Structure formats: C-alpha cells, structure tokens
Amino acid sequence: MTGFDELWPGGPRFRQQEGSFRLSTDSVLLAAFAADIRAKRIIDLGCGAGVLTVLLSHARPDAVIRGVEIQPESAALCRENMAANGFGSDGIVTGDLRQYRELFTAGEYDLVVSNPPYFTSGSGVTAPDDRRAAARDERFCTLEDLCAAAKYLCRWGGSFALVHRPERLSEVFCAMTRHGIEPKRLRMVQYKAGAAPNLVLIEGRRGGKSGLSILPPLLLTDENGADTAEVREIYHL
C-alpha cells in the first residue's frame, strides 16, 4: 500500500495499492468534463480506488455521489480515500455493476460516469496482475454491460459521461444508442496541437434527441512542451 499523494498542493489526496495504476490523467480530465453537468445524484461505475469519485465530490459538494466496484480491495480503498478527503464513504458499493437491477433502483441518478477498461478482453499485452488487468481490459465489464447499466441507472433526460480511446469511438456510440443514450457532446484530448487524439471525452443523454456538439480539442501541452493554461487550471497549478 502506498502513502497518500496530493493531486495538487492542499487538494484531494489519494492512497493507491502497490501494483495498481497510478493517478491517471484520464480520470482527472473526465472529472473536469463532467463537473459542469447539472446533477444532484451521481454514480461512478467501476470506481476503482476512487480518483474520479473523490474529484467529483470535491467539485460538486452539493451532490450525492456513489460508486460501485467489483474488486473488494479497490472498493475498500475508495471508501478510505473518500473518508480521507472528508466525504461520506457509505455510498461505495462492493459489487458487480452487471447486477445493476439487484444493486440499485432504476432511474435513480442524474449523472452516470465511468472511466472503463479500454481494451477488449484478451487484446494487447496482458497486465501482470488481476487488479491492473481488470482496469485495462473488459474481463468484468464490456461496453454493452456499461451502457446497459448506465441506461438503467440514469433518469430520463439524465447524462452518461465517460472517457475512452478514439479508436473505439464508433463502438462507444453504437453501444450508447443501442441502449437509448444519445451522444450529445464530444471532446478529443491531444498531447499537442496537430497530434492525433489519444483520449475522447463523451457525454450522452438518455432519451436525448439527435445532434452532437464537437468541442474544441483539449490540448495537454503547448508548442514549447509546457502544460497548457487549461491543464494548469484543471490541476490548480
């Protein structure tokens, strides 16, 4: 087990398991992307150690925020991280999000968020341990599973926000629409201007009308290789 790491001086702090993924840009950017979506009740699907859960709790102290995580050690760590940052931890459920009907009430949330595994099970390099493997590939949760859970949990007109890889964007859109979630907002994340995107931030709306807003790309570095003003703002630098 590692000690606590602060995301920025005086900001949220996190403890993570040895061998798990370190604090990721993905969850930080998704939290910033989702923070402006109007919501009083939010749930994080596959919350892991709670980076996204804590960041949204920090950004939206007026909201009730819950999480579900299949791995008991990660769920316990999420509760610890929530408590360490002064937030209630009772809303973190240890369970399989594919069993959403047994775990939750339909239409209970205004906003569903997720930083899911990016790769199909068995593709690419296998992670060295189960925790990293579960965070990397879809052995416990496919895109279809995720979107089915999001549809069930999200109220009519509510939002589903996630981060994913650009090469799977068409799959994400198809899975969302199959489950009645219309893609409404898209933002590409690029390391620098002119580079191919390496992440996509997506918001869909349950029962939404067609029409997709494509936002300007989020650039991580400027022409000199320094953090952009937007990244510095996100990280409170």
Where are these regions (language model features)?
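Class I SAM-dependent transferase core
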Residues: 1-37
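A structural micro-motif
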Residues: 12, 40, 63, 90, ...
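General small-molecule cofactor/ligand-binding pocket signal
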Residues: 15, 66, 93, 184-187
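Conserved SAM/SAH cofactor-binding pocket of Class I
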Residues: 32-125, 148
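Mobile active-site "lid"/loop adjacent to the S-adenosyl-L-methionine
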Residues: 116-145
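Conserved Class I SAM-dependent methyltransferase catalytic core
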Residues: 140-191, 195-197
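SAM/dcSAM-binding transferase cores
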Residues: 196-237
